[in-house]
Amino acid sequence: MGAAEAKAAILANKTALGIEFGSTRIKAVLVDDKNQPIASGGHEWENRYENGVWTYSLDDIWTGIQDCYQDMARDVKAKYDIELESVGAFGVSAMMHGYMPFNKKGELLVPFRTWRNNITGEASEKLMELFNYNIPQRWSIAHLYQAILNGEEHVKDIDYITTLEAYVHWKLTGKRVLGIGDAAGMFPIDTTKADYNQEMVDKFDELVAPYGFSWKLRDIMPKALVAGEDAGVLTEEGAKLLDVTGKLKAGIPMCPPEGDAGTGMVATNSVAVRTGNVSAGTSVFAMIVLEKELSRPYKEIDMVTTPSGHLVAMAHSNNCTSDLNAWVNVFKEFAEAMGMEVDMNKLFGTLYNKALEGDPDCGGLLSYCYFSGEHMTGFEEGRPLFVRSPESKFNLANFMRTNLYTCLGAMRVGLNLLFEKENVKVDRLLGHGGLFKTKGVGQQILADAVNAPVSVMATAGEGGAWGIALLASYLVNKEEGETLESFLDNKVFADQESSTLDPKPEGVAGFNVFMDSYMKGLSIERAAVESEIW
């Protein structure tokens, strides 16, 4: 779209704005009536580790979103010579989970406890037993119950507990609501009713009844909403809070606030049943939209939902490309020592493509990329390891193939539960992140690892801020009865270029051989962690 059309869309209020709080960056994306980005803004921020808790202050949150909005407004002014006064629709998203408890006066009772905190182990275990459902430590209900078990004073004064994006939305609209994708990161969801699981709500209320709190669980959680539902409008107070210059007008329709997993699914068009996406960078996770509930809970699998309320299984691994990148840097140092100019893109491309020349089973080589602990395989700490036998075929191609395979090893442990024990079917996966930057390499290896076609979009996309802008657009632009899946297929991604690679039988067989060695070799990783060398 040209500048003139974009300007016309802004003046006619045929735009949608999305703002997402990532862990290190707050990003704003403004889209036009074709759902394409026409302006953006950003603000860098960092979490703090205070009194044993990973947190962001309320001041960080508000100065951050204000600066991000101003940066986007400046972009609009620079590109189109317009002072931004309104948008057609607006949505806020953020890192999921965590714990923000407020009292009746709207005061935060303890500092925001983010998803990064692993301080709710006891509560997580007890709730999993009570509900017969996996309750990860970062979920809001685990934080609440741990605070109760700890005897924390603030619990008796709670009037509202919420997540980051629902907190911001509450202050902008006055509405205590949350998109179902992150509502599912607070408390288990009954997908047949698109609401919290009432049987489990009752069990929790019964569990904490002896403490004599004045509240019941449902009263203090945000109402769960699905994509496209009315979530209120930007109030006068909210407009002033967001735009400190006072130019932004109130009354803008707002979509349900949503978590970053949900916006990531939207931005990769992975919201339909039997589709999924794999994000592979420093960490790696797969999210697969399920046809039905799993037969039982698994500690390795997190259950969330799409913004429409379809059940999603998430297999998350803490470790992916850090060790691989470290090896690539060793080759960079070698090249520089030989007096060569090193282009990092060319170096990555050369080494990644070399991997495709390796034996499908990596010639008997084995690697663990555990920079940190890995819950999928039961490690609190990690040690990056490369191991081989004297008989292994040790060459550059097999070495690189091994280092790429192991990036997906821990995630595959979780996926095995879904594919083998639960018979989950996937028609298409979409890959995004650094592992897929070199055309056709990470993509082929993932296809072989999961034995399913893998697509990669020609453009990396705009990420979660674009995803929440699309959810805002869906709120105001959907036809009567139009599903989110249909809206994305027909009005957002219809012309999106992508390439798809099918799994190769020899690659699938080779990855399975590698995984057999990977599982058998975990005792080597255990010995490295328990040794007193590092």
Pin down the residues of each PLM region.
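A sequence-level detector of short linear motifs
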Residues: 39-40, 110, 178, 313
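Carbohydrate-associated surface elements
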Residues: 117
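Active-site core segments that coordinate phosphate-bearing ligands/cofactors
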Residues: 3-11, 17-18, 121-178, 187-214, ...
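Short beta-strand-loop/turn "lid" adjacent to the catalytic site in phosphate-handling enzymes
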Residues: 77-114, 134-136, 169-181, 185-190, ...
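N-terminal glycine/serine-rich phosphate-binding loop of ATP-dependent small-molecule kinases
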Residues: 1-109, 125-126, 157, 218, ...
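Intrinsically disordered, low-complexity sequence elements enriched in Ser/Thr/Gly/Pro
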Residues: 23-25, 114, 136, 301
